């Protein structure tokens, strides 16, 4: 942060504000405190009655060329479900029904929170988009595990295959040391 959005001062310093316990960006002129919060990623695990899930091959970084569930960053003024459905349309041209919250995954080492919903594939007119070079249904036993982009996607798919979507999972993912 270079300038205070409240008073336009360039006097932004890092310090622990009175009554707080974490270092924050603070304007030295007007004393405005600026909080940096985790980003929320939201998406959909889309499935069919034929034991298939939909995956998108990423055509953008990070993890270009790897498979993922359609997902992306939540925008201001949208609910996590609205964001998940928007991202699913943007990345796969897909609509889903019977949408249910499925996983909430905290990933503290990268300051992100992932929320995945499950949803039943409604239209089979899905296809590639600027963000996905390929969009494909995979039988459960044909999922390309070694080509999946992110631990959050792997965890969500494994939980779905083990438990179906009758339960909500709330877990923390940490890097292996």
Placement of each model-derived feature along the sequence:
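Short glycine-/acidic-enriched loop or helix-start segments at secondary-structure transitions
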Residues: 16, 65, 147
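A short beta-turn/loop motif at secondary-structure boundaries
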Residues: 19, 61, 105-109, 176-177
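A generic structural signal for beta-strand entry/edge sites
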Residues: 22-24, 52, 64, 112
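Long, charge-rich boundary regions
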Residues: 31-101
């Amino acid at each position: 942060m270079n300038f205070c959005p409240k008073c336009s001062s360039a006097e932004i310093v890092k310090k622990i504000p009175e009554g707080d316990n974490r270092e924050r960006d603070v304007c030295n002129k007007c004393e405005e405190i600026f909080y940096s919060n985790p980003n929320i990623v939201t998406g959909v695990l889309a499935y069919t009655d034929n034991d298939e899930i939909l995956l998108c091959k990423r055509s953008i970084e990070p993890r270009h060329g790897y498979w993922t569930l359609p997902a992306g960053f939540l925008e201001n003024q949208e609910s996590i479900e609205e964001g998940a459905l928007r991202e699913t349309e943007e990345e796969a041209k897909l609509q889903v029904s019977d949408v249910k919250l499925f996983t909430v995954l905290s990933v503290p080492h990268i300051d992100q929170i992932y929320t995945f919903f499950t949803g039943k594939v409604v239209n089979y007119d899905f296809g590639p988009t600027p963000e996905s070079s390929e969009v494909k249904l995979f039988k459960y036993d044909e999922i390309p595990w070694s080509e999946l982009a992110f631990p959050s996607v792997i965890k969500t798919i494994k939980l779905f295959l083990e438990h179906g979507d009758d339960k909500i999972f709330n877990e923390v993912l940490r890097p292996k040391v």
